[in-house]
Amino acid sequence: MAAVAVAAAAAALRARILQVSSKVNSSWQPASSFSSSSVPTVKLFIDGKFIESKSDKWIDIHNPATNEVIGRVPESTKAEMDAAVSSCKRTFPAWADTSILSRQQVLLRYQQLIKENLKEIARLIMLEQGKTLADAEGDVFRGLQVVEHACSVTSLMLGDTMPSITKDMDLYSYRLPLGVCAGIAPFNFPAMIPLWMFPMAMVCGNTFLMKPSERVPGATMLLAKLFQDSGAPDGTLNIIHGQHEAVNFICDHPDIKAISFVGSNQAGEYIFERGSRHGKRVQANMGAKNHGVVMPDANKENTLNQLVGAAFGAAGQRCMALSTAILVGEAKKWLPELVERAKKLRVNAGDQPGADLGPLITPQAKERVCNLIDSGTKEGASILLDGRSIKVKGYENGNFVGPTIISNVKPNMTCYKEEIFGPVLVVLETDTLDEAIKIVNDNPYGNGTAIFTTNGATARKYSHLVDVGQVGVNVPIPVPLPMFSFTGSRASFRGDTNFYGKQGIQFYTQLKTITSQWKEEDASLSSPAVVMPTMGR
């Protein structure tokens, strides 16, 4: 039965990729075999059309639960990437001059279409990325919330005025779009992260070049089709595909004014440096090592549930996964119960009923996670729960790692210093809250952290002293809702303006200030003033 389900799921994905992205060649049909020459190809989206790439370089898309090839995505050619930017540049003046109310209406229609197609988008995510269907729906929903927030643009883009700054003179400023903006998205949130980017940028009047992860392009392609159906003019949103060459193209192209990136530290540092060197605004959300500090007065049952869910959900492939627990004082005694609770999680393919977590994205990701677990044992830590040898019936070729808990971890160990990005929770122990705060602050990352306590003074002390951009109090994954901004800090972020919220609007716009004087009478002096104007002195 499992094999039948796998085949059906793969067939469904092939059919949807074809339906969404092969508009230019309606005679092409998916073949019944899985050979690399017959699986559906993901198209480019340029000037409002889904176009077959002329590239001779193609990347296989795999179902992480089976490692079967379910699609192929091109590495866009230089000419194709140039055409995409040219389309953005050509359509920018008209889109920027479009009434903000009209742009708002496009986004209002878009959020409704996302709601209507949420389950279909989630299924694409599940097949390409490996998430459970429930988690994939959450991926889409959190992106949808940003789209809904973007619909408030008429309030978010209000300017400032100061009348009568001096006699007959007024001062006012307003926000204008930048031009062509670009986004580079990761594999772990195929819907949410693109929806952090292009809706916010485009409602401000920018046009947008999107490069989804080559591992999970399906959701972005469907989101682009829905955006077009919402009334967005052709050419305002364009999509290219690729790897290193596409990234360099985005960083270097003179017509691209701003870059949004989410992904690894290595890639983020590179993009920030190269893009900034070419005069672009860059915002880069990067790696993390998120700590959950457990105080002995915490609500025990709630805390254990929160730790397990935040550590192992999405197989740990979240930049806000709670990958590190610090047990303070008597909370150390809860460790056996934490292990027992994690053992109950069900590992399976994402579409299987009752699955709590699915596979990792690639065999290479699985190997890396297993090697980091190995490093813990070699460096003196203890493995209390080992998920390396897990086998999922019917999905023996999948990239599965079960929940893993490593105790007796020290800050100098590799499994602590590295971002694992898998279903692994490393556990440290301290005697005091101050020791826990020092551990968190000595770590270079600053994405998120959480404290579990019933003491308000303890929570306040931790929130104020910890050097992390996003703090949860009895909230394990403190990702802000989009009326606020995603405020990772230190080594987890590069740039000076964060994603979505008010800062998202600031990133995608520039200020223009007008100083205006309308005199009722003609000048009483016959000679010009050559000293610095003081305006109101």
Swiss-Prot record:
Main location per the UniProt record: mitochondrion
Matches recorded under Pfam families: Aldedh
Catalytic activity: 2-methyl-3-oxopropanoate + NAD(+) + CoA + H2O = propanoyl-CoA + hydrogencarbonate + NADH + H(+); 3-oxopropanoate + NAD(+) + CoA + H2O = hydrogencarbonate + acetyl-CoA + NADH + H(+); (R)-2-methyl-3-oxopropanoate + NAD(+) + CoA + H2O = propanoyl-CoA + hydrogencarbonate + NADH + H(+); (S)-2-methyl-3-oxopropanoate + NAD(+) + CoA + H2O = propanoyl-CoA + hydrogencarbonate + NADH + H(+)
Its EC number(s): 1.2.1.27
Subcellular location: Mitochondrion
Transit peptide location: 1-34
Entry's Gene Ontology BP terms: thymine catabolic process; thymine metabolic process; valine catabolic process; valine metabolic process
This protein's UniProt keywords: Acetylation, Mitochondrion, NAD, Oxidoreductase, Phosphoprotein, Transit peptide
Residues annotated to bind NAD(+): A185, F187, K211, E214, R215, S264, E419
Post-translational modification: The N-terminus is blocked.
Modified residues (N6-succinyllysine): K49, K54, K57, K78, K119, K131, K366, K378, K393, K519
Database matches in InterPro entries: Ald_DH/histidinol_DH, Ald_DH_C, Ald_DH_CS_CYS, Ald_DH_N, Aldehyde_DH_dom, MeMal-semiAld_DH
Residue numbers annotated as active site: C319 (nucleophile)
Role played: Malonate and methylmalonate semialdehyde dehydrogenase involved in the catabolism of valine, thymine, and compounds catabolized by way of beta-alanine, including uracil and cytidine.
PANTHER family named in the record: MALONATE-SEMIALDEHYDE DEHYDROGENASE, METHYLMALONATE-SEMIALDEHYDE DEHYDROGENASE [ACYLATING], MITOCHONDRIAL
Protein name: Methylmalonate-semialdehyde/malonate-semialdehyde dehydrogenase [acylating], mitochondrial
Organism name: Bos taurus (Bovine)
